[in-house]
């Protein structure tokens, strides 16, 4: 028995970016024309019942959700964070615990919950970034021990609260040019595993997707029914990785077996094209044909690989209809 067996049994899941600069940004379609509101109000309005119901309709086995990304805003309370950055409850950390509320709904459908956290903290905000200890991300300033201790103490509070709630974590932004190596990644590993050693965790540095952006010859038409494998396969980021982070621009990476260097093979890629965040993350449309993803899913599952589909989530807690219907039909075909 392997610790990722349950993950493999789920086969596929959905990731969503729930962010201040996405759903709470009036310039984004996911804002639904509501405009920008205080963070606390924004989080209080999200319909977790609908999120869970639509995930169930699509047949997703698990859901991966961002706690934060770059901005200082968190989707749940965190007294440690408030103390370090000098904020009040509800200012940056919502008073509503969206994670607990969401999990209560997901459990009704046996949908597992995973959480996304980062390795670069709230760097987009000068005050919070400096308070945590890492703000100069774009000048490739190396992370410090002060930052690692502060930031993992924030993670520790969430970990202890969600010990029996979530099934695992996906940690982003562990770039080598920040100074990340296994010694520094161990801060996150020890923080999480000391709370729940059964959690499965992935550590990401965006290596595969960065290569794809840099190499023009990797550009291809994802509507083509005959996909070509990416010349740069997924890789294991850290010795502490239970499953591959698996970030890729497109679903055109393939395994050679269930495990890679002892870690469960897994891919994460956006369903939409570049109308959301960079690379299509959180986008609203579908860039693939049904036939393309049908064959892709079959191939990955034949190796006991796991697939996470990044989809756009609207402010109300609804998925884009085009994407939702596409995944419903895809699962019908796969389950026939």
Model-inferred region functions:
Residues 1-336:
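Mature catalytic domains of secreted/periplasmic carbohydrate-active enzymes
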């Amino acid at each position: 028995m392997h610790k990722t067996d349950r993950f493999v049994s789920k086969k596929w899941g959905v990731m969503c970016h729930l962010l201040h600069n996405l759903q709470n940004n009036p310039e984004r379609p996911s804002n639904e024309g509501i405009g920008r509101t205080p963070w606390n109000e924004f989080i209080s309005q999200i319909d977790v019942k609908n999120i869970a119901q639509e995930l169930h309709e699509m047949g997703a086995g698990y859901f991966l959700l961002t706690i934060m990304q770059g901005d200082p805003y968190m989707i749940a309370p965190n007294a440690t964070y408030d103390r370090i950055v000098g904020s009040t409850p509800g200012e940056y950390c919502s008073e509503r615990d969206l994670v607990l509320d969401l999990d209560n709904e997901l459990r009704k459908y046996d949908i597992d919950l995973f959480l996304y956290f980062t390795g670069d903290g709230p760097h987009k905000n000068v005050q919070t970034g400096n308070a945590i200890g890492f703000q100069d991300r774009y000048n490739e300033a190396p992370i410090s021990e002060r930052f690692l201790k502060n930031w993992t103490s924030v993670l520790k509070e969430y970990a202890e609260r969600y010990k029996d709630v979530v099934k695992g974590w996906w940690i982003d932004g562990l770039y080598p040019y920040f100074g990340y190596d296994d010694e520094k990644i161990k801060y996150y590993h020890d923080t999480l595993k000391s709370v729940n050693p059964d959690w499965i965790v992935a550590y990401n540095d965006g290596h595969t997707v960065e290569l794809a952006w840099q190499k023009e010859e990797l550009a291809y038409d994802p509507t083509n029914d005959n996909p070509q494998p990416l010349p740069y396969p997924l890789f294991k980021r850290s010795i502490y990785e239970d499953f591959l982070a698996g970030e890729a621009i497109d679903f055109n990476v393939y395994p050679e077996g269930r495990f890679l260097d002892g870690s469960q093979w897994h891919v994460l890629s956006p369903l939409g094209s570049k109308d959301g965040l960079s690379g299509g993350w959180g986008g609203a449309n579908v860039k693939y044909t049904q036939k393309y993803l049908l064959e892709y899913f079959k191939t990955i599952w034949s190796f006991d690989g796991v697939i996470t589909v990044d989809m756009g989530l609207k402010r109300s807690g609804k998925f884009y209809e085009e994407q939702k219907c596409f995944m419903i039909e895809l699962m019908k075909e796969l389950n026939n």
